């Protein structure tokens, strides 16, 4: 069977891993790094850049460099208005209220799924190169607290990247697979996952190959980006107070501040103070201005104290839902780069009364777990049973705008639940089923996943018709809803995909565009390689004295005639080989003739 890869599609960085010889292995990217920045950029010429190369040019191209896109995936614009203000690229709503990102270099709008697909494609290309075979199937991880539309959108991103996404699994669950693969004894573990843009807490019982999620909680608006933003705001406020200049209006300066803030945050995990130096941050009539600030760890902890405090409630909620106390937890596993922050580690110790287990690499553990799950699906890994849960309650809107729960949060999936409902008024011939996700009592306060109508109900007094509503959640955590009128057998169903912000025709168009882009990228790479080889052969031909042939090849290079370059390169390489052979033979013959001229003589030793 073809290899199935595991992918951690992160807010800040992404990782891909695969099972090799029964062990999960992280696949390095084409630059040789084990993690790939989740950054996509388009140059002024419209060329696509992904990963480290895109991140490096962000300062000079902030409006066309897209990062932290995971915060927007599967969401409506009304849900992310605050986050949209934190990035230097334009984020807008389309006619349906979906999030769209404007790229001035291409003069077009992109869906977040399209941007994420470019990151996935880079990872998969690296894996295909590494394995020596084309990779088409994957397991992709998502934050445990992602709702249905965010999960579906992640699956769509995989599809646009040319992948068959076999399974969507929760990041903390994947981390537990990596941590507990060789554990034989039963343990209750708490996975504390604070990434670049999301925060999850999951409690699992693991042992003898069974991984059962007992409860999950989280906050999809909390992550390392928010810690960076606190430093950026502090720098902007200080600069405004000292210099009277507002740097938040300058996109290039803002990008430099964001990068400096991330660097300072990382440094403060190891040292107690750091210097932030940004020469030529701006200029006035008096000349250039240079930013030079010192940030201590104590100041950083004070700036981010509200964010640290926000990590507390999901931990307490997960313990309550699992009906456990902190004494029942055997191990605490830290996941995500932001868990390196000392104040975060201290909070975990205070909340759970134990030292966190740091035996796993927080940047790679999720991808490794995804690779193990991929191995299970591919039949490479045996004797593992994964029992995950749905993170949020699912239900329907009933009379009076009430949210009636069908499947409570933390129900083990896959699952199926049926309830009987009826009509609200006499002679009602249709019903509208409004599907909701969330924990609030009123329908309007929860996330709307979609609506559909069941027609053809026979006229009858209110309360008489029996409408059977079935909720079905698959192993990916994606929901299907069916409504059936019992007396007629008429039914209507919906797979909740509308909230993913893309319809099927849009996805198909994006798949074609992505394939076209991949083909264009391949052609560009081929052309660069052809030109590089032609130039190398041209210099060799010059040295060998093949002036006419070299000039002909040089003309093809100057005219960017790639077909001509290919043909002439082959011809000139043949001539170079012939000339080298002739030179070698001439030298050999010369040595032989020299030897023939030598007269052998006997010398007598003098006594």
Swiss-Prot record:
Subcellular localization, as worded in the UniProt entry: Plastid, Chloroplast
GO CC aspect terms: chloroplast
Xref: Gene3D superfamilies: 3.30.420.40, Actin, Chain A, domain 4, Substrate Binding Domain Of DNAk, Chain A, domain 1
Pfam families per the UniProt record, alphabetical: HSP70 (PF00012)
Region (Disordered): 579-607
Ranges of compositional bias, category Basic and acidic residues: 592-607
Role according to the record: Acts as a chaperone.
UniProt cross-references to NCBIfam families, sorted A to Z: PRK00290.1 (NF001413), PRK05183.1 (NF003520), prok_dnaK (TIGR02350)
Family: Belongs to the heat shock protein 70 family.
Protein's UniProt name: Chaperone protein dnaK
